[in-house]
């Protein structure tokens, strides 16, 4: 079964972008390559149970097992040694990516407190978009009663768009609620 958002991309977004940016081939149209979810855990240094809780939360949100990220180098000021676990991340591709993006745009973002739309300035210059969420309980998969601590997470949407303008057009047509 093709995810709803992917179907919308293929039937509505691709023809519209081909017309708007005058692409010669369908392969030139920007597409979403992957979505990376990351939870950075500063408290994992003292509290090793925080890592397990964050892993469980991210697994519930993403639908696949996250990988533990480790410190690349030692930083004495943060009491971090090289190789210490300091976060969890997961990379979504394919159907899971499409269904997550659908849930993010239609369920999660509208549930945020004081939500008026996402900023247009969060593009990185190469058509990729980043969103930071302050709490994981906005996801319907997370049981509010079982949460030990509120943790934020980063969502990075990686596209094949060469610049921010085309990346913005892609996400806007897919239904990302930008504040204009």
Swiss-Prot record:
Signal peptide positions (record): none
MF-aspect GO terms: rRNA binding; structural constituent of ribosome; tRNA binding
Keyword Zinc in annotation: no
Keyword Lipid biosynthesis found: no
InterPro entries, sorted: Ribosomal_uL5 (IPR002132), Ribosomal_uL5_bac-type (IPR020930), Ribosomal_uL5_C (IPR031309), Ribosomal_uL5_CS (IPR020929), Ribosomal_uL5_dom_sf (IPR022803), Ribosomal_uL5_N (IPR031310)
Domain of life: Bacteria
GO biological-process terms attached to the record: translation
Record-linked PANTHER family: 60S RIBOSOMAL PROTEIN L11-RELATED
Name this polypeptide is given: Large ribosomal subunit protein uL5
Primary gene name: rplE
């Amino acid at each position: 079964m093709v995810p709803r958002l992917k179907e919308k991309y293929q039937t509505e977004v691709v023809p519209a972008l081909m017309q708007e940016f005058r692409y010669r081939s369908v392969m030139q149209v920007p597409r979403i390559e992957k979505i990376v979810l990351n939870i950075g855990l500063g408290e994992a240094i003292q509290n090793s149970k925080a890592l397990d809780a964050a892993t469980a939360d991210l697994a519930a949100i993403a639908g696949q097992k996250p990988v533990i990220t480790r410190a690349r180098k030692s930083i004495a000021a943060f009491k971090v040694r090289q190789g210490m676990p300091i976060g969890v991340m997961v990379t979504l591709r394919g159907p899971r990516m499409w269904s997550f993006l659908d849930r993010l745009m239609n369920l999660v973002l509208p549930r945020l407190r004081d939500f008026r739309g996402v900023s247009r300035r969060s593009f990185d210059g190469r058509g990729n978009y980043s969103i930071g969420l302050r709490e994981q309980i906005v996801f319907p998969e997370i049981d509010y009663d079982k949460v030990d601590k509120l943790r934020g997470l980063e969502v990075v949407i990686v596209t094949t768009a060469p610049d921010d303008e085309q990346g913005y057009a892609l996400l806007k047509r897919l239904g990302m609620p930008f504040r204009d």
